[in-house]
Amino acid sequence: MSTPVLELRGIVKTFGATRALDGASLRVAAGSVHGLVGENGAGKSTLIKVLAGIHRPDAGSLLLDGQPHGHFSPRQVERLGIGFIHQERLLPARFTVGEALFFGHERRFGPLLDRRSQQREAARLLDDYFGLRLPANALIGELSSAEQQMVQIVRALLIKPRVLVFDEPSVALVQREVERLLRIVQRLRDDGLAIVYISHYLQEIEALCDRVTVLRNGRDVAEVSPRNTSLEQITRLMVNREVGELYPKVAVPAGALLLDVRGLGRARAYQGIDLQVRRGEIVGLTGLVGSGAKELLRSLFGLAPPDSGEVRLDGQPLSLRSPREAVAQGVALMPEERRRQGVALDLSVQENTTLAALSRFVRLGLLSPARERHTTLELIERLRIKAHGAHAKVRQLSGGNQQKVALAKWFARCSSLYLLDEPSVGIDVGAKVEIYRLIGELVKEGAGVLILSSDLPELIGLCDRIHVMHRGAIAARFAAGEANSDRLLAVATGAQRAQNEERPFYAYAIAI
């Protein structure tokens, strides 16, 4: 690499007795996308806060174009041409698009704020950069997550940065929005910017990055090229263990039949679904978008009631007319959209944990905060939730800990059937292992688990059986030990037929 535009060299940062960064380094070239990956606690956030001027390092240096710079304030960072796209949308909800774009860089006509000029320029910039036609007087709070992010990117580009840092930019986006984001990043790279891209989604890292720095325990342990390094190798560098160790296999003999689905159908979604889950069993479900797998899981929780067929739970008919009825009969759902549907971000850990089981904490007609707190503290310890007590806001927790809180509320209710929709999406590898451990605890206690996942290695590593849906039907079934990525992908592409089916099935694999 020629002289990098940006270099962080030997950065050390301690907080009390905790050494968050232990000589970490990062080198980023112009016209490249440089990935930064690592488990929670590896030091990614601290390193970026040092770069942003929020934290003063105890040792180490920052160089721009090979020239050393001392510690600087966030405002000075901006003047040096370093911009940031943060995971959390930081633009005030009551600002207009024009106000948000030019906040801190307001346009004036004499002593007066020139709002009209700002609004015209804001609309032009959004259209020029992204073809996004938003009214400049639209409120930020009325925009989608993707639209807010576009505003944030344009705002960062107004300082004419040479370095742009994307911190978990795709967390709140749906797939088509992620694809647009990746195209934008590629365009910025082609324009000559040096991009730092931080993500738990290693598929994005593989597709986008020219180089990747791996952090572990506050140190940069490797800098690799995704073209020459597999995602499994990157994962191994992150966690310092073999990929096979990520999936703790739980030796639990299958128990009595828990969920029995016969001939289930829903118009324009799926038909003729037969599916069984026994107590102590983990069953996998996968399929392309539109295959019917997502709709099937929603139906089993009463969100999209089926039109035909029969579902029994513990031998009794299961009513699927509403989520309320499903929950009352022992069904739990952990949705993919964790931040929107799985937890209430502005409520505390305690309020989230007890939300689905409030009747357990009522005495003499009144809610008992003491009993709520006792149960919450037990679950915080059992699920190893990292939070500053039961009253910490869920918004303040990492993605992995938010996922644990989403699961904790069903632990509190002692549900018998757990429907897990993409349970490890958007969390780092270490947090995934914790979620897998908790899934193992559920089956040890006699629950049944149905996992919908697009991560084939995850399904292969965890499940006793895997069902694959295609065009609204279960097209293939695999027992544990029968499936591997090569075989699944061969069948998925139509190159090979499943031995136990007359037609091919289709699935897609997303590595760890």
Swiss-Prot record:
InterPro entries found in the cross-reference section = AAA+_ATPase, ABC_carbohydrate_import_ATPase, ABC_transporter-like_ATP-bd, ABC_transporter-like_CS, P-loop_NTPase
Per UniProt, which keywords does this protein have?
ATP-binding, Cell inner membrane, Cell membrane, Membrane, Nucleotide-binding, Repeat, Sugar transport, Translocase, Transport
Please name the top-level EC class of this enzyme: translocase
Which annotated residues bind ATP? 38-45
Show the SUPFAM superfamilies listed in the entry: P-loop containing nucleoside triphosphate hydrolases
Q: Which domain of life is it from?
A: Bacteria
Cellular location(s): Cell inner membrane
The membrane-topology field of this record reads:
Peripheral membrane protein
CDD domains (alphabetical) = ABC_Carb_Monos_I, ABC_Carb_Monos_II
Chain's role: Part of the ABC transporter complex RbsABC involved in ribose import. Responsible for energy coupling to the transport system.
This protein's name: Ribose import ATP-binding protein RbsA
User: Which species?
Assistant: Pseudomonas putida (strain ATCC 47054 / DSM 6125 / CFBP 8728 / NCIMB 11950 / KT2440)
- In the UniProt record, what gene is named as encoding this protein? rbsA
